[in-house]
Amino acid sequence: MTELKAKGPRAPHVAGGPPSPEVGSPLLCRPAAGPFQGSQTSDTLPEVSATPISLDGLLFPRPCQGQDPLDEKTQDQQSLSDVEGAYSRAEATRGTGGSSSRPPEKDSGLLDSVLDTLLAPSGPGQSQPSPPACEVTSSWCLFGPELPEDPPAAPATQRVLSPLMSRSGGKAGDSSGTAAAHKVLPRGLSPSRQLLLPASGSPHWSGAPVKPSPQPAAVEVEEEDGSESEDSAGPLLKGKPRALGGAAAGGGAAAVPPGAAAGGVALVPKEDSRFSAPRVALVEQDAPMAPGRSPLATTTMDFTHVPILPLNHALLAARTRQLLEEESYDGGAGAASAFAPPRSSPSASSTPVAVGDFPDCAYPPDAHPKDDAYPLYGDFQPPALKIKEEEEGAEVSARSPRSYLVAGANPAAFPDFPLGPPPPLPPRAPPSRPGEAAVTAAPAGASVSSASSSGSTLECILYKAEGAPPQQGPFAPPPCKAQGAGGCLLPRDGLPSTSTSASAAAAGAAPALYPALGLNGLPQLGYQAAVLKEGLQQVYPPYLNYLRPDSEASQSPQYSFESLPQKICLICGDEASGCHYGVLTCGSCKVFFKRAMEGQHNYLCAGRNDCIVDKIRRKNCPACRLRKCCQAGMVLGGRKFKKFNKVRVMRALDAVALPQPVGIPNESQALSQRFTFSPGQDIQLIPPLINLLVSIEPDVIYAGHDNSKPDTSSSLLTSLNQLGERQLLSVVKWSKLLPGFRNLHIDDQITLIQYSWMSLMVFGLGWRSYKHVSGQMLYFAPDLILNEQRMKESSFYSLCLTMWQIPQEFVKLQVSQEEFLCMKVLLLLNTIPLEGLRSQTQFEEMRSSYIRELIKAIGLRQKGVVSSSQRFYQLTKLLDNLHDLVKQLHLYCLNTFIQSRALSVEFPEMMSEVIAAQLPKILAGMVKPLLFHKK
C-alpha cells in the first residue's frame, strides 16, 4: 500500500477574503441521514435499503453529503480550487439522487470566524485537521440499550467489518510522513469508537483516505518502551464477542493534546506502566449531556480517596483457591504466570490478543447476545487472580500488569457509564506485587471524601453490581455470560471438590450465582466423603463425615451433639450398606477389607502411598485402599456390631477416632475396648484430634518492624499490616491441614477464611500476650511488642485497649492450650453468609464435632458435670463477645484503608483484597454470626 499523507480538510484561504463556507466551515453542512433517520436512495450507494436496524449503523457514521466517495485517491493532492470543484460536483451528484444539501445558516460568518480562531494551525506549516460535523459528537452504545425511537425507519447496511487501523513502520515521534501516515481520527468520536473506521464501501471524510484491506486487523497502540510487540495483537472480532478497550472505555470524548503526533494524529494515549488496562479517559464536568445518554454519563466521580484495588470477592476467591487447591492445578500456578489466560472464543484465532487493549464481554456487530452462549467447559477462563504459595517474608517476582473485572459488572447493563482515570494507588509494601489497578463501578453521585463515610455508602460503592439479580432482556445478560449459557462460575466447579457429579449435573446451566442454601430444612448437596487431595494428610475421616438424616432437618443442628451418620461409605464415598467392621462402608469396601485381612496380602503402592480412593478409582491401588480402611478404624472384630442404635453408632465412632481419656459409661467403654488393636498388629490409629491441632499450629511469625527507629503512626500501622499479610497466608496454610475443612466446598472454604481472618488474628494476639507476657502487654510478634506506654503514644490507643481485653480474659479464665486450639477452630466456623453455605450440612457436622472436642478439652481439667458446664459457658461466652470486639477492628481497618494514601500507610496486596471485598459486607450486616448464647 502506498504511503498516504494526512492532510487537513481546510486549506488556507486568500488573505483578506471571506472564508469559504464550503471548505472553511464543514460544521455548517447538513448532517447525513444517520442510523436513526429514514432511508434514502442514492446512486452511489446501491446497497443501502430499508432493512431492520443492525449494529453497523450504530458503529459506523455516515459522512457529510457534501463529500464524494469517488475522489478518495486524489483528495490529498487537490488545491483549494480542486476541493471547491469537487464539492460542487458532489452537490450535483447528490442532487440527481434526490437529496439536497442544506443551505448555509445565516450566522455562517460568525461560525467561520469562530472556527478560524479555534481551528487555527498550531505552528507554521502545520494545520490541525477538523473532522466533518456530521460525525456524532456523543458516544455511541456498542451494546444496544440506546436504540432509536422508531427502529423500522432506521436504515442498515449488512457489511463486513471494515479494516481497522494499523501502525506504520516508523515511530510515533517521526514527523516526516511516517507519523502522518496514521489515519486522522474524527474528533467527535469517543476514544473507544475512534478505533473503528467507516465500513468498506462507504465514503470516508476528506481528512484521511483509507484503502480497505481484505482482513480485519487489530488496532495497535503506541506503547512505552518495553511494551508488547506488534505481533501480540491478533484479530479483534472473529466469531466471539469482544469489546474495544482502547484509550477509553467510558464513552467520553477525549481532548486531543497539543503535543500529539505530527499532522494532528491522535491515537490511543500511552499507558502508564503503573496501571493496568483497560484504559480510561477523563470526562469533563462541563461537557453537555449528549442526546440518548443517561445521567451517569456526565457524572464526575471523586475517586481521590478510594484505593484502586481488586474489589471483586470472586477474584480473591480465585487467589485463595490457588492456595487451597494448588495440587489440582497441572502446572498452571507457576511463579511467573499468576494470572489465568484471557478468555478466548473456541472459534477465535489462536493469535493472542493484547489483554490490556481488548477487554472481554463485547458483542460483534453481526452477532446477538443469545447466539454466543459460552460453553460450560472450554478453553476460556475468566480473568482470575491467583496467589503463589510463598514463604513468609519472601520477595514476590514482579509481573506485567493485568486487568481486573468488577464483580457483576456488565458492559451491556451500563453502556454509557463513564470511567474516570485510575487514581494513584495507596503506598504498597515491598513484597506486594506492583502495577495493579481495578476498574471501579460506582453509582451516580456517590463519592468517598472522608473516613466518616457510612458503611452503606461504602457498600454501595464497592458492591453496586455484585449482589444485583441478573437482568432479563436481550441486552442485559447475567455478568460475563450470554443468555442461555452456563454461568462463569461453572468452570470453577470443575475443580476437584466434595460435590458429586450428580449435583453438578443437577445445576446444569444454573445461573452464575449459587442458589441460596438456608441453615435448616433444605435439601442436602451431593458429597464425596472420602475424596481428599494429594498432599493432604488423610486423618480422622470418621469424625469429618457425620451427616444429618432428613428426619432431623427441621431441628436446629447448631448444638446437636448426637446425630446419625448418613449412609455414605467412609472409604470410597459410595452409598454405604451398613456398619461393617466398625465403620460405615459400602459392600465393595467391606468385601475388600475382609479378603485383604484374611488373605494376608502384601500390597505395595506403585506411587507415593497417597493415591486417591473414591468410587471410581478405589480399585486402582489396593495398598492405599487397605491403608485407608485401617485409618478409618476397620477391624475384623467389629463385624459383630452391625446393628447399632443412634447413640451407640455415635459413641462407637468416637471411640474409634478418639479414645477418651476421661471416664466414660460402661457401654461405650466396652465398645472402645473391642475397637483396640493388639500390639502385634502393624496398624497405627490416627492420633487424637487435639494432638493433631497442636501439631499443625503455625510457627512464630515476625512483623519485620525496625525498633531502632522512633515509632510513628504510619510505621506502626504499616508493620501491623505486614504482619497481618503474613498471618493471613499462615491462616490459609493452617486451614488446609485442618481436619474436615477440606471436605467443605471450595467456595465455602474461601468464604469462611474471608469472614474470620480478623477474629483469628486478634485471638492469636491474645493467646501470645497471655503466654509470653502474662497479658501485661500486646505481643503482636517477637519484634513488635507494645507496652502501655507505646500504646498511649500510638494513634490507635483506644483500639489497643479493646484488643487488650482478650489476654486479660485469658488470664482470668486460665485457658489451656487444648481449649484455645478448639476455640480457634470454632472462630473459623463462627460466621457464615446469610443464605448459608454450599456444603451447609458438612459444615454443621464439622462445627458440632469441634464443639464436642471443646467439651473433651474442658473435661481434661474440670471434673464433674457442674464445673464442666460452667467452664463451657464461660468459654463460649468469650467467643460470642469477640463478634462485637472484632467489629470495631473491622471499622477501624476499613477507615484506615480508605485513607491509606493520606496517612502514608501501606497495605499489602492480599490483605487489601480481603478488606475491600468483605469488610463492607460484614459491616453492612450481610453475614450471619453464629452465637452460642442469646443476647
UniProtKB/Swiss-Prot annotation:
Cellular component annotations (GO), alphabetically ordered: cytoplasm; nucleoplasm
Low complexity: bias regions: 232-246, 335-350, 434-452
Chain positions recorded as progesterone binding sites: 768
Signal sequence residues: none
Protein name per Swiss-Prot or TrEMBL: Progesterone receptor
Annotated segments matching region Mediates transcriptional transrepression: 165-305
Post-translational modification: Phosphorylated on multiple serine sites. Several of these sites are hormone-dependent. Phosphorylation on Ser-294 is highly hormone-dependent and modulates ubiquitination and sumoylation on Lys-388. Phosphorylation on Ser-345 also requires induction by hormone. Basal phosphorylation on Ser-81, Ser-162, Ser-190 and Ser-400 is increased in response to progesterone and can be phosphorylated in vitro by the CDK2-A1 complex. Increased levels of phosphorylation on Ser-400 also in the presence of EGF, heregulin, IGF, PMA and FBS.
Region (Disordered): 1-256, 328-353, 415-452
Biased composition (Pro residues): 418-433
Annotated source species: Macaca sylvanus (Barbary macaque)
Any matching Pfam family: Hormone_recep
Record-level Gene Ontology MF annotations: nuclear steroid receptor activity; sequence-specific DNA binding; steroid binding; zinc ion binding
Motif LXXL motif 2 per record, residues: 115-119
Residue intervals of the NR LBD domain: 681-915
UniProt keyword annotation of Phosphoprotein present: yes
